[in-house]
Curated annotation (Swiss-Prot):
Subunit description: F-type ATPases have 2 components, CF(1) - the catalytic core - and CF(0) - the membrane proton channel. CF(1) has five subunits: alpha(3), beta(3), gamma(1), delta(1), epsilon(1). CF(0) has three main subunits: a(1), b(2) and c(9-12). The alpha and beta chains form an alternating ring which encloses part of the gamma chain. CF(1) is attached to CF(0) by a central stalk formed by the gamma and epsilon chains, while a peripheral stalk is formed by the delta and b chains.
Class of enzymatic activity (EC top level): translocase
SUPFAM superfamilies: C-terminal domain of alpha and beta subunits of F1 ATP synthase, N-terminal domain of alpha and beta subunits of F1 ATP synthase, P-loop containing nucleoside triphosphate hydrolases
Taxonomic classification: Bacteria, Pseudomonadati, Pseudomonadota, Gammaproteobacteria, Alteromonadales
GO terms under cellular component: plasma membrane; proton-transporting ATP synthase complex
Listed name of the protein: ATP synthase subunit beta
Gene label: atpD
Length: 458
């Protein structure tokens, strides 16, 4: 355990000098005992000086303070004791419910599983959300991204997925709140408590008000806890909200360390940093990690380097659209932009594939006809096109669905729709079984039976 002294403090960056023969390694955790602060080594500057990033507030730090090298990277509690608890980036409890009392700790910087240890699966994970189950089905043990700009419903969608999957799921869940609002973390805790599944969830939070070093590492802390459960042979759900804040924290740290920025001001190591996190989120022959990640899209630009780098790592992408949200259709998932590797007849079956394809074809044709309708009106369309437009509008409305987590805001009870009912409903619309029903009957309902019931009431 070597000791050094603080020689320079610039915001969250702290330079520490050690004896030449005891210089800490990169990623080692250093502790300033008097300030109860942990630093992580980022660079060795030479002459025994290392440059570190503070994991907490650096207010009040001064030159000459004693710093102790722990000799290893940041380690966090893992295992059963973390369930039902809220922790920070260092694995310290922040829920005022006493010590974690862990039996084991893991370091947060770990190697990804080797290629031969990884397993692939084609088992589907039903979410109960029509548009997702139909157009971009999730795989058990896969990686899913929820892409969307500000205010189109990423967090609400994620909460609904947690509600539908985590509550019905017999395994364990880990939630990593990366650079998001404290209020959302609070809401999530009480949501889990009310539904009685708190003892199956471990929560790790590093909110918006935390320093960049904290936000950069909190995703790794959550992932380390999920990996432990996976290595014990369990099926784990890993939720991250929000991956963009992880990238942004990396950008801040990179700038603080004086690195030259690359495209759009991002860090030059963007792809590598994303890879370090994403390569570890994988299923092995022992257990599985199914991850759902919210990804903020700056200025609704999907070609921005941050979301574009994330796309490459995912099995399914759920793209939320501002245009669809402005039509009052929630969840505002864009069925033409969202994709899934699982949407293959060999995985989902021929019927599901054909119905999903049919829905996308009709919606795409409607999109093409919109300009003609705007200029010439509906009367100039052929009868076939008029039918297509009518069915497309019904499909658009039917893609909406009341959420359980939004009941308090909307006043309408949430609906869970099984995959079988979803396929049956859309197949019926495509085949013209419901051509005689009014368009409005398809809006904000669960299964197709409710549409018929709603239409008959009118």
């Amino acid at each position: 355990m070597s000791t050094g002294t603080v020689v320079q403090v610039i915001g969250a960056v702290v330079d520490v000098e050690f004896p030449q023969d005891a210089v800490p390694q990169v990623y080692d955790a250093l502790e300033i005992k008097s300030e109860d602060l942990v630093l992580e080594v980022q660079q060795q500057l030479g002459g025994g000086v290392v440059r570190t990033i503070a994991m907490g507030s650096s207010d009040g730090l001064r030159r000459g303070l004693e710093v102790v090298n722990s000799g290893s990277p940041i380690s966090v509690p893992v295992g059963e004791k973390t369930l039902g608890r809220i922790m920070n980036v260092l694995g310290q409890p922040v829920d005022e419910a006493g010590e974690i009392g862990e039996e084991e700790r893991y370091v947060i910087h770990r190697e990804a599983p080797s290629y031969e240890d990884q397993s692939n699966t084609t088992e589907l994970l039903e979410t109960g959300i029509k548009v997702i189950d139909l157009v971009c089905p999730f795989a058990k043990g896969g990686k899913v991204g929820l892409f969307g700009g500000a205010g189109v419903g990423k967090t609400v969608n994620m909460m609904e997925l947690i509600n539908n999957i985590a509550k019905a799921h017999s395994g364990l869940s880990v939630f990593a709140g990366v650079g998001e609002r404290t209020r959302e973390g609070n809401d999530f805790y009480y949501e889990m408590e009310d539904s009685g599944v708190l003892d199956k969830v471990a929560m790790v939070y590093g909110q918006m008000n935390e320093p960049p070093g904290n936000r950069l590492r909190v995703a790794l802390t959550g992932l380390t806890m999920a990996e432990k459960f996976r290595d014990e042979g369990k099926d784990v759900l890993f939720f991250v909200d929000n991956i963009y804040r992880y990238t942004l924290a990396g950008t801040e740290v990179s700038a603080l360390l004086g690195r030259m920025p690359s495209a759009v001001g991002y860090q030059p190591t963007l792809a590598e940093e994303m890879g370090v996190l994403q390569e570890r989120i994988t299923s092995t022959k022992t257990g599985s990690i199914t991850s759902v990640q919210a990804v903020y899209v700056p200025a609704d630009d999907l070609t921005d380097p941050s979301p574009a780098t994330t796309f490459a790592h995912l099995d399914a992408t759920v793209v939320l659209s501002r245009n669809i949200a402005s039509m009052g259709i929630y969840p505002a998932v864009d069925p033409l932009d969202s994709t899934s590797r699982q949407l293959d007849p060999l995985v989902v079956g021929q019927e599901h594939y054909d119905v999903a394809n049919g829905v996308q074809t009709v919606l795409q044709r409607y999109k093409e006809l919109k300009d003609i309708i705007a200029i010439l009106g509906m009367d100039e369309l052929s009868d076939e096109d008029k039918t297509t437009v009518s069915r497309a509008r019904k499909i658009e409305k039917y893609l909406s669905q009341p959420f359980f987590v939004a009941e308090v805001f909307t006043g309408s009870p949430g609906k869970y729709v099984s995959l079988k009912d979803t396929i049956r409903g859309f197949k019926g619309i495509l085949e013209g079984e419901y051509d005689n029903l009014p368009e409005q009957a398809f809006y904000m309902v669960g299964s197709i039976d409710e549409v018929v019931e709603k239409a008959n009431k009118k």
